[in-house]
Amino acid sequence: MSLHAFIQQANQFGEQRQPFFFLIDFEQQQPIICPLAQAAELGLFFAIRGQQNVNWQTEMPHKPFELHKFPISKAAYQRGFDLVQKELQKGNSYLLNLTYPTEINTNWRLEQVFQQTTAPYKLYYRDRFVCFSPECFVNIHHNQIYTYPMKGTIDATLPEAEKRLLDSDKERQEHYTIVDLMRNDLATVAEKVEVTRFRYVEKIQTQKGAILQTSSEIRGDLAENWQARIGTILATLLPAGSISGAPKEKTVQIIHAAEQRPRGYYTGIFGLFDGESLQSAVAIRFIEQVDEKLIFRSGGGITILSELEDEYQELIQKVYVPVG
């Protein structure tokens, strides 16, 4: 399905108040949309803030979760990092989300990871990938659209971790940039856009311990009958600013040059429309089945203040599964 066809179908479903599920890849080449009741038939199983379509129960894992990481070398990461830094220094980008795959071994199957992880937005695409995302893309209800850009993480066990996170010049600049980008994005589809919460801290539990992350809340007003434009609204906002960067169009070109491989559904979006409201997520925290291997996709925001070692370690730190 083309993106144009997706937009038309989503707008039609929205106008009819027909509940539907959708999934759009980062490159916007393989969008999927279907009536909500048909998602399971396509092998798409979701659990999104209390709404889920899982009609099966996988056997409980017999052993505690184990995860072994085999990240790319620092030299391989540095090639992409250096390319990005050159573009930042030229002023072609101010913030860029650089991602790479990490091969992993685990004693759980993808469907077990899906059922046992804790995250507000979960998706299992049978035999293809599992996603357990903490990050909202946009939520729409009562004619208001919300987004919650998430930028800035730190190991929660470090001394004064929250203070270090909030006081970091690099993390502050990164967060200001993404909030400004997302505020401008929302202004293309909504009115009276405002930041209603700025840089609040949340804790996420992982199998290796807790991490802290900072988010903000941005809100705008939509016109009546926005449901009839739901596909147009989603497409206008793509790709998600938090996993691309600013300015968006040029930054995406740099991403393709640095990463040298398509992201596919990783860092795309997925969600559901229940007939009145929409909930959606950015497809991060993502394990993909590639032939006989499992690949965990992760990354982080790069600014001109970024240090190679810090960013390389963040890439590895984000390879985690929120279980237990």
UniProtKB/Swiss-Prot annotation:
SUPFAM superfamilies: ADC synthase. GO terms for biological process: L-tryptophan biosynthetic process. It holds the Pfam family Chorismate_bind. InterPro entries: ADC_synthase (IPR005801), Anth_synth_I-like (IPR019999), Chorismate_C (IPR015890). It comes from the Bacteria. GO terms for molecular function: 4-amino-4-deoxychorismate synthase activity. Gene3D superfamilies: Anthranilate synthase. To the C-terminal of para-aminobenzoate synthase component I. This is Uncharacterized PabA-like protein PM1464. It comes from Pasteurella multocida (strain Pm70). The lineage of its organism: Bacteria, Pseudomonadati, Pseudomonadota, Gammaproteobacteria, Pasteurellales.
